[in-house]
Amino acid sequence: MSDLLYTNGPVPYREDLFRVFHEAGIEVRFGVPAGDLRSEWERERPDRVFVPEFSAMALTALRSRKRFGFKVISLCDDSMDMICGNDFGWKHRLARRVIPHYLDGIILHSPDVRLWYQSRFGKGFFMPIIADERRVRPELERVLPLSRQIRPTEKPIIAFVGRFVGLKNIPALLRAFEPLRNRAQLVLIGDGPERPVLESMAPHALFTGFLFGDERLAWYNLIDILVLPSTQEAYGAVTGEALMAGAKVVVSRQAGSSDLVREGENGCLFDPMDEKGITDCLEKLLETLPSGRPVALRENLLPYRFETCIQDLLKEINLL
């Protein structure tokens, strides 16, 4: 059996998924021009073609399916918030109503979204957007000396990780943190057009800029609470990254990664329009943190394990 997966380019949060797909015989191809797809299919005669979302690639594959005899499976990042009307655009909303009818399968990151698709279209596989703990956990342990070296304070660290843009709703976090500034250190990891405004709002916060590789991993060992306050967020892979490192999370209900949160266990959910709700969540989680925490490898707080999920997904796909 021959399978081809197409994506527009390397996607860091899909790194482990694509690696295991490749090991399972699904060839991953990046940035193939739409005009070259049919010639590839003519030459290689795949049995299954994996496409991103409801993209032009998906439409090309569906139009060509009868000619080449392959099945079409989409990787879709829809969240329940998007399904309920908070979409990034009308084109995706329209495509969601039509294209799933014609797909042979669709891979979704949320159990609730999967149920929604199954109830309306009779199809849907589940695979959360998480990394492989067998790869990441040893790396977190390896960078512990760097974590200890760059630790800025003994106080608990509350952090945001991502782009400084409007949809991330960072000003709400800064205002919500204000009553807690004597109890914790706020760290903003990232950059973007809103940085000058944010720096003027929070002179007490630590701004690191974008971080990559070991330095980014080292900070995850230090973060006690990660906050994702977005008003619109298809997923938010940083939630899973933080939980895998043992940090607790405060996540907007409008983020797709809210599905990873188990309230009372690994985090707290809030309405991103309710700044007091953010403060309340932070206060609640601060009370649960041990005092004088050593910088050490912590328990993985993710509710799912990559190996279990990917093996279940491959079994379901192979039944098509």
Predicted feature descriptions by range:
Residues V72-G89, Y102-G105:
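A short, histidine- and acid-enriched strand-loop-helix "catalytic/donor-clamping" loop
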Residues E263-G264, C268-E275, E283-L289:
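Conserved acidic donor-binding segment of nucleotide-sugar-dependent glycosyltransferases
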